[in-house]
C-alpha cells in the first residue's frame, strides 16, 4: 500500500514536471556522443502547486505508515489538507498532524487574529509589489538586457546582490499572504522564513530559508538516508543528495541542479572546515570584536548564497556561470 501510494504521488509529479526535462537531457547527452535521439515531448500544463501538494500528500502517506499520523477516515478533511488553497502556490508545506486537527476544531471569530492576518496579507503585498518589484526593475535593467555583458563587474555584482534580496522578498511575500489568509480563516500555518539573509553561516541560512521544505527533506529523505549517523563522508553525500533533489524540486532544469548542488557543496565545505576556521581566527583580535565578526560572517554567507541564486535566474548553466565570472572580473 505504501509503495503504491508513493508511486502514484511521485509518478504524477514526474509526468507533469520532469518527463520533458529528462527526455531533453537524455537527447542532449546522446548527441554529445554523436547519437541522434528525438525525445518524446508532452504538451501538457502542470496543475498549479503540484510540487507543494505532492509533498504534502507524500508526507501524509509516510507519517501514516510510520504510525505518526492516524489515517484520516473523512476524505474531505484529507482533500482539504492536501489542497488547502493558501499553501499550494508558495507554501508552506504543511503536515497532516498540524493541519487536520485544526480543520476539525470549531472556529470562532477572533478580532485580534483576523486583523493580524489581514495586516500580514498587506505586508506580503507590500513586499511583493513595492520592494520586490522595485528591485526587479533595477535587476532587469542589467540581466534583462541582451547586452548585459558590456556592464562592468561592480554593476553585475550589485545586480546579483539585489536579485538575492528581490527573490527573498518575492518568495517570502507569498508565504506572508498564505499565513495571513490562514489566520483570517482561523488556521495557524508554519512560518517559512525567519530573516534568512541575516544568517551567519550556510547551516543557519538553511534553518531559516523555506523552513517547511528544509524540514520535509530532513525528515523524509536526509534521515532515512542515514543522516549524520554513518560518518562524515556519508553525511556529506546525504546532504548533496538532498540538495540535488531540492534543486530539481524547485525547477526541472540543469541550472536548478547546479543551484542545488552548489548549495550542498557550500554546506559540506562549511561543516568540514569549521574547526580549522575557528583555529585560524582564534588569534585575530579584530575577529574577537563581536560586531565585526557578525558583519563579516553575514556578508560572506550572503555573497556565497548570491553565487547560488544567480542560477535561479539563469535558464542555462553557462549563463549562470558567466554571470558569476563577469561579476568577479574573471
Regions found by a protein language model. Name each.
Residues 1-330:
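Membrane-embedded transmembrane alpha-helical bundles that form the catalytic cores
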Amino acid at each position: 500500500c505504501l509503495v503504491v501510494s508513493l508511486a502514484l504521488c511521485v509518478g504524477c509529479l514526474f509526468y507533469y514536471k520532469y518527463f520533458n526535462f529528462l527526455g531533453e537531457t537524455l537527447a542532449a547527452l546522446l548527441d554529445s556522443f554523436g547519437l541522434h535521439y528525438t525525445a518524446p515531448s508532452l504538451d501538457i500544463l502542470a496543475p498549479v502547486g503540484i510540487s507543494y501538494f505532492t509533498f504534502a500528500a507524500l508526507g501524509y502517506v509516510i507519517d501514516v505508515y510510520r504510525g505518526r499520523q492516524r489515517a484520516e477516515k473523512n476524505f474531505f478533511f484529507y482533500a482539504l489538507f492536501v489542497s488547502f488553497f493558501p499553501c499550494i502556490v508558495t507554501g508552506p508545506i504543511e503536515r497532516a498532524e498540524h493541519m487536520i486537527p485544526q480543520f476539525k476544531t470549531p472556529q470562532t471569530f477572533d478580532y485580534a487574529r483576523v486583523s493580524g492576518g489581514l495586516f500580514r496579507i498587506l505586508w506580503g503585498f507590500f513586499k511583493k509589489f513595492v520592494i520586490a518589484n522595485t528591485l526587479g526593475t533595477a535587476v532587469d535593467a542589467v540581466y534583462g538586457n541582451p547586452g548585459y555583458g558590456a556592464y562592468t563587474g561592480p554593476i553585475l555584482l550589485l545586480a546579483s546582490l539585489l536579485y538575492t534580496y528581490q527573490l527573498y522578498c518575492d518568495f517570502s511575500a507569498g508565504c506572508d499572504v498564505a499565513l495571513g489568509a490562514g489566520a483570517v480563516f482561523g488556521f495557524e500555518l508554519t512560518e517559512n522564513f525567519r530573516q534568512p539573509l541575516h544568517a551567519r553561516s550556510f547551516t543557519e541560512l538553511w534553518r531559516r530559508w523555506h523552513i517547511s521544505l528544509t524540514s520535509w527533506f530532513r525528515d523524509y529523505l536526509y534521515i532515512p538516508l542515514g543522516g549524520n549517523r554513518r560518518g562524515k563522508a556519508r553525511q556529506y553525500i546525504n546532504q548533496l543528495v538532498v540538495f540535488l533533489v531540492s534543486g530539481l524540486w524547485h525547477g526541472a532544469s540543469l541550472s536548478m541542479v547546479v543551484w542545488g548542488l552548489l548549495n550542498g557543496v557550500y554546506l559540506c565545505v562549511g561543516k568540514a572546515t569549521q574547526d580549522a576556521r575557528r583555529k585560524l581566527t582564534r588569534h585575530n583580535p579584530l575577529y574577537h570584536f563581536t560586531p565585526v565578526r557578525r558583519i563579516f560572517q553575514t556578508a560572506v554567507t550572503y555573497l556565497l548564497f548570491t553565487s547560488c541564486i544567480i542560477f535561479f535566474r539563469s535558464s542555462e548553466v553557462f549563463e549562470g556561470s558567466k554571470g558569476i565570472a563577469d561579476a568577479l572580473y574573471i
